[in-house]
Amino acid sequence: MMYTNNCVNCVNIPGNRPAARALVQGSPDYPLLHGTVSFYQTEQGVLVSAEIFGLPSHTQPCQNPVFGFHIHSGTSCTGNASDPFADTLTHYNPSDCLHPNHAGDMPPLFGNDGYAFLLFLTNRFTISEIIGKTVVIHDMPDDFTTQPAGNSGKKIACGVIMNSRR
């Protein structure tokens, strides 16, 4: 579908209710980090909305925190002492693309005094593909270059994507 500059109501959200949702919780090092990532199926693709609270913040100029944000192929937010979310595995990448073209590569979260809000439309995945997968927030921004996953640091928060229309 090609968009024109006279598009009105280009993204129609049927029922205004997300088809899937992930409740994100921080690791033991980030117990106040939490939020919701919602997925809405539209005719144009999947509309993703993320609202995150308790992100690490900086007080120095030019150090506004930016966080890597991805869908991972694992189905659990469990792990071990050194990597509490090790079981999230790698970025969701069913077509075996190079980074940053994994289906699970999403725009970064920009922190604002511990808060981030993000809204974007994608055709990289469908909602049925990602049910049961995990959403992960990393402590560093994705550089969109380094292989295989963008060098975005340690995993600081995770949520499992669940069907919300049951």
Model-assigned labels for residue ranges:
Residues M1-R166:
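N-terminal leader/targeting pre-sequences
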